[in-house]
Structure formats: C-alpha cells, structure tokens
Amino acid sequence: MSAVDPIADMFSAIKNAIMRRDAFLYVPSSKMKERILEVLKREGFIQDWEALKGEKYEEEFKKMKELAEKSPNPKMRRYLQQLIDYNKGTQYPLKIYLKYLDPKKRRSALTNIVRVSKGGRRVYAGVRTMPYVKRGLGIAIVSTDAGVMTDHEARKLRKGGEVIAFVW
C-alpha cells in the first residue's frame, strides 16, 4: 500500500475484504483512521475494531502464526504478513471486524465507501451545503473542529468541515 493517501488505502482494503468475504482485516494505524472507524462502528457499518498494541499484538501474532503453520489456506499467511508489515515504528495494526447482514450469503452492511476529499482537492462543506448521501440513507463522514462525525451530527451541532467520505 502506498503512503500517498492512507485513508483511501484503508477504504480500498475494506472494500477488497468485503469482496473476499473476510471476517476481519488489518490496516496500519493513525489517529484519523481510528476516528473514522469509530464513526463507522457507531453507524453500524462495521461490527467492531481494535488497536493491536503491546500484549494484544503479541497474542494476535502468536495466534496467526499458529494458524498459518497449520492451515494450507494462503489467507492466513497474508494476515500474518500484514501483521508483521503494519507493526513498524510508532504504527501498530488496527483489526477491523466486518459486519454482514446475512451470514449465509455474506451480504455486507457496507455497500460502498467513497473518498471525497483527497490530497489534491480538499472538499469543504458548510452547514447549509452539507451533502445528503443517497437521499439520507447513507452518511457523509465529516471532519470538523469538534471532531470526526457524520453529516447528521454536524448539521445538528451546526458545524461545517472537510467531507472525508460518503458511505452507504
């Protein structure tokens, strides 16, 4: 993954994991990613997420190493490699548990996630110009001076800010 737009990389990793019908995935950490994941969890698009620091990382690494050695499934080796790659310097892996509405068909709660504000073109919206996503059925994730929140919460607090993504 490139370091040009880490948030877009996280969104791509989530979409790819949903297409593979994975139960969870790992992404490198950042404060902004943690805030975005908290909004996605609160709105019901993902089941949960956790930061794997210190002992949690060691436990997860042991578990994945054992599974990768026992299983011929290449998916386990990929997870193990991600754990190793994302635990460098001050970064640590974030484990995202995906949410599926129908366990048999594995239909995801998250249909699509689109990055709006990018490095080359920042998109800002005031209270009156805050976009509605899918006529109110989706959410816009907005970064305001009061923190990262949905478009509904931003309208309620009368705050504008940078539109990070559309989710439905």
From Swiss-Prot:
How it assembles, according to the record, is: Part of the 30S ribosomal subunit. Contacts proteins S5 and S12.
Check the record and name the Gene3D superfamilies matching this protein.
Answer: 3.30.1370.30, 3.30.1490.10
What InterPro entries does UniProt report for this protein, alphabetically? Ribosomal_uS8 (IPR000630), Ribosomal_uS8_CS (IPR047863), Ribosomal_uS8_sf (IPR035987)
- Organism this protein belongs to: Aquifex pyrophilus
Write out the GO cellular component annotations: ribonucleoprotein complex; ribosome
Q: What is this protein called?
A: Small ribosomal subunit protein uS8
> From the UniProt record, which GO molecular function terms apply?
rRNA binding; structural constituent of ribosome
| Role this protein plays | One of the primary rRNA binding proteins, it binds directly to 16S rRNA central domain where it helps coordinate assembly of the platform of the 30S subunit.
Q: What GO biological process terms are annotated to this protein in UniProt?
A: translation
Family, per entry: Belongs to the universal ribosomal protein uS8 family.
What keywords are annotated for this sequence in UniProt? Ribonucleoprotein, Ribosomal protein, RNA-binding, rRNA-binding
Instruction: Name the domain of life.
Output: Bacteria
